[in-house]
């Protein structure tokens, strides 16, 4: 019985801490525009179709890398 009460109190305490922390952190993100431009530049920085995409290349393909020829391919269009 004691253990059950201790577990219930611990769960309630942790839940309260989570709610207080989540409510307190709203609107405190710094450098929002810098973060979003970084994501966009990473998303558009890719290898075009027809170029080599083997394991030594640091960029990813805009489409997919053919497993046999190691050449970037565009996704097939329906």
UniProtKB/Swiss-Prot annotation:
Domain notes: The presence of a 'disulfide through disulfide knot' structurally defines this protein as a knottin. The cysteine framework is VI/VII (C-C-CC-C-C).
InterPro entries in alphabetical order: Conotoxin, Conotoxin_omega-typ_CS
Cysteines paired by S-S bonds: 46-62, 53-65, 61-72
Propiece residue ranges: 23-42
Segment forming the signal sequence: 1-22
Name assigned to this protein: Omega-conotoxin-like Ac6.5
Role of this protein: Omega-conotoxins act at presynaptic membranes, they bind and block voltage-gated calcium channels (Cav).
List of residues that carry 4-hydroxyproline: 55, 67
Gene Ontology molecular function: calcium channel regulator activity; ion channel inhibitor activity; toxin activity
Principal location: secreted
Keyword terms of this UniProt record: Calcium channel impairing toxin, Disulfide bond, Hydroxylation, Ion channel impairing toxin, Knottin, Neurotoxin, Presynaptic neurotoxin, Secreted, Signal, Toxin, Voltage-gated calcium channel impairing toxin
Matching Pfam families: Conotoxin (PF02950)
Tissue expression pattern: Expressed by the venom duct.
GO cellular component: extracellular region; host cell presynaptic membrane
Similarity comment: family membership: Belongs to the conotoxin O1 superfamily.
Keyword presence, Iron: no
Subcellular location: Secreted
